[in-house]
């Protein structure tokens, strides 16, 4: 059988045209593909700087507070100086979310920054402990508003494919302060005085915020007409939730029956309030956004409750020095950044749901491995690897939930939903720490090993629950 030859092109030789299939990695991309391109550079640097300053302030104040309380003769208000900040941040988060949805993120950001800076100045110039506590309450109000406003800015300023990288940068903004913040705070207290722990932050926060002015000016209000945003009701429920959070914090400092009564009453009040503040179905773990909001709270509670007791466990039960116990926590911070970076740069095309399932599984395995060192036959390196793995999983979870919240929200809902995301975290962590703290205080004198086991069982249970919720997102 003869093969016919191809027809001859009478036009003569033609230039050869080769078509190549480009992989996604080889596909040309716009010039502003980086979050540090000219279009986004000032916004990115300004937001990350504010995140880093907030992180440094939180960590540095925690390290300096014993000196502050002694200098102002205010040990009896020591707990309120910490818990009050969290309580007022609940109000700041909630109000900023509603405000940003109706008028854009500029107003809540500027008002939040004003409260934050004024609170720092009030605390820095405090002549008595009551004045310092007032400053801390104002700080919390401002910090809550700033955090929600920044999330809304991410949703309004960056296209969806940039958002994972922005949230990875936010994680980086926490890593450096977590590594050097406490030590730097100690040096400031020792050589400059404790007041500069508060007074130094405004000097940097205001210039960082000014970098955001061009981006904020481009954002328009998403309000439709003059609709009522129900701000009065929001204030009432947010105030109730903040008081319940404060009562939880107070209950966690008590022992025996008073602790149980405080925590029980606070949890009932908290459930009643958050039912009105969180998206419908959050407490029932409905699929979609409600499960995203719930997962943020459960995963954060598991991680931070474990982190609270890990240094104590390593020092008292395994004989590590404070510096080595702190080094273990630093591994978790580095793991968190690595996991957050991976979710923003992974090339396998994993969906956010897949990242959440892998992240929650890694966090659960890491927590179990970390807490296994409660038993002496388990070698200490297991805790090092376990806590790094826990941080890695949490980095994947945390940033992915932030991205999902924005993608599942209409522009006029981003403020309310991001405030619900952070509200879920704050209140869940407070509840977990209060309950575990009360249990630990109950057994620490008579059966400390039992106290550790009960507290760590709570963190493991929360981690397992997080893996279940991740399949409902």
Residue ranges with predicted function:
Residues 58, 62-66, 118-124, 175-190, ...:
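Membrane-embedded alpha-helical segments in integral membrane proteins
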Residues 90, 97-228:
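Helix-loop-helix hairpins in multi-pass membrane proteins, especially solute transporters
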Residues 64-90:
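Extracellular/periplasmic helix-loop-helix junction of adjacent transmembrane segments
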Residues 190-296, 307:
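Hydrophobic transmembrane-helix bundles of small-molecule transporters
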Residues 69, 73, 126, 142, ...:
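Short helix-loop-helix connector
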Residues 2, 10-11, 15-56:
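Cytosolic juxtamembrane N-terminal segment immediately preceding the first transmembrane helix
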Residues 40-63, 82-84, 92-95, 106, ...:
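12-transmembrane solute porter fold
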């Amino acid at each position: 059988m003869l093969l016919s030859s191809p027809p001859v092109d009478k036009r003569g030789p033609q230039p050869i045209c080769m078509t190549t299939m480009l992989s996604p990695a080889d596909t040309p991309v716009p010039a502003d593909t980086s979050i540090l391109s000219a279009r986004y550079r000032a916004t990115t640097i300004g937001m990350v700087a504010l995140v880093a300053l907030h992180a440094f302030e939180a960590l540095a104040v925690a390290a300096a507070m014993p000196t502050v309380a002694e200098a102002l003769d205010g040990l009896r208000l020591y707990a309120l100086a910490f818990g009050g900040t969290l309580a007022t941040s609940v109000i700041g988060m909630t109000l900023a979310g509603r405000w940003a949805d109706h008028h854009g993120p500029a107003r809540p950001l500027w008002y939040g920054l004003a409260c934050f800076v004024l609170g720092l100045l009030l605390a820095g110039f405090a002549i008595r402990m009551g004045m310092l506590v007032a400053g801390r309450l104002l700080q919390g109000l401002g910090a809550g508003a700033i955090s929600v406003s920044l999330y809304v800015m991410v949703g309004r300023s960056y296209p969806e494919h940039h958002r994972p990288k922005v949230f990875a940068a936010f994680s980086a903004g926490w890593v450096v302060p977590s590594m050097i913040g406490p030590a730097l705070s100690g040096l400031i207290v020792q050589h400059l005085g404790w007041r500069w722990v508060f007074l130094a932050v405004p000097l940097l926060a205001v210039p960082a915020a000014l970098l955001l002015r061009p981006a904020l000016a481009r954002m328009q209000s998403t309000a439709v007409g003059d609709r009522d945003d129900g701000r009065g009701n929001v204030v009432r429920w947010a105030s109730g939730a903040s008081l319940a959070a404060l009562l939880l914090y107070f209950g966690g400092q008590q022992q025996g029956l008073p602790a149980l009564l405080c925590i029980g009453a606070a949890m009932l009040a908290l459930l009643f309030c958050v039912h009105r503040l969180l998206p419908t179905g959050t407490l029932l773990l409905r699929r979609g956004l409600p499960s995203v909001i719930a997962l943020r709270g459960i995963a954060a509670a598991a991680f931070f409750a474990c982190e609270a007791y890990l240094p104590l466990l390593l020092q008292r039960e395994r004989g590590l020095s404070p510096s080595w116990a702190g080094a273990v926590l630093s591994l978790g911070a580095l793991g968190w950044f690595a996991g957050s970076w991976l979710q923003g740069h992974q090339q396998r095309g994993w969906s956010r749901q897949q990242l959440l399932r892998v992240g929650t599984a890694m966090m659960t395995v890491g927590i179990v491995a970390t807490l296994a060192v409660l038993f002496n036959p388990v070698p200490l390196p297991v805790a090092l690897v376990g806590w790094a793995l826990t941080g890695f999983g949490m980095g994947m979870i945390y940033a992915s939930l932030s991205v999902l919240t924005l993608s599942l929200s209409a522009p006029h809902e981003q403020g309310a939903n991001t405030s619900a995301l952070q509200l879920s975290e704050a209140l869940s962590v407070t509840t977990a720490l209060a309950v575990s703290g009360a249990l630990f205080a109950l057994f620490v004198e008579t059966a400390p090993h039992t106290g550790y086991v009960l507290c760590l069982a709570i963190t493991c249970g929360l981690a397992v629950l997080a893996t279940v919720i991740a399949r409902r997102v």
